[in-house]
Amino acid sequence: MNLILMGLPGAGKGTQAEQIVAKYNIPHISTGDMFRAAMKAETEMGLQAKSFIDKGALVPDEVTIGIVRERLSQDDCVRGFLLDGFPRTVAQASALEEIMKDLGKKIDYVLNINVDSGLLLKRLTGRRICKECGATYHLEFNPPAKADVCDKCGGELYQRSDDNEETVANRLDVNIKQTKPLLDFYEELGYLQSINGEQDINKVFADIDVLIGGLA
């Protein structure tokens, strides 16, 4: 099974990715991991990527796509993979289609975990962190016993500056605008599957499991 996982920040992608790869024993391939592995192995594309990163420059698409090609050609991807964080643009998605053709494979599903932006805002702005021990809480989903006080050490809880409502709303807005053309592209190809991410975590996975179970 060859899958792409999509979803806005706070949609619960990481949790679902863990469950998918654990059950189906396919590699979870994230962009960051791919780059780190290619640079460590000193592959041709990994060395090219390193030369840009060392200069503080953006890695060009052709290098990123080359790294993806190298990674998807590895033995552990024979039975399938879960791509996370790639592609980010329609140009990258088109290049991925070419890679898959060259490998004699196809993408089975693009799983988009859908959550209303208002709920995402609540999920992302509710986080509180202890100043003393770093313990993490959530005002709605995992609140401390006493408001603004850490259960573990009694330290004061605070909200990170980038978790405030305005910053999070802007981040979501940018993500929605960037993601829409990609979702439209995959909708047209017939790969896109929308998953209701507003349910309990286990129910979200159960829905994914029903969908992809037939591919195993």
Curated annotation (Swiss-Prot):
Catalyzes the reversible transfer of the terminal phosphate group between ATP and AMP. Plays an important role in cellular energy homeostasis and in adenine nucleotide metabolism. One of its GO terms (cellular component) is cytoplasm. PANTHER family: NUCLEOTIDE KINASE (PTHR23359). It comes from the Bacteria. Its EC number is 2.7.4.3. Monomer. The keyword rRNA-binding does not apply. The lineage of its organism: Bacteria, Bacillati, Bacillota, Bacilli, Bacillales. GO terms for molecular function: adenylate kinase activity; ATP binding; nucleoside diphosphate kinase activity; zinc ion binding. The gene is adk. Residues 30-59 are annotated as: NMP. This is Adenylate kinase. It is found in: Cytoplasm. Belongs to the adenylate kinase family. Coiled coil: none annotated. Keywords: ATP-binding, Cytoplasm, Kinase, Metal-binding, Nucleotide biosynthesis, Nucleotide-binding, Transferase, Zinc. It holds the Pfam family ADK_lid.
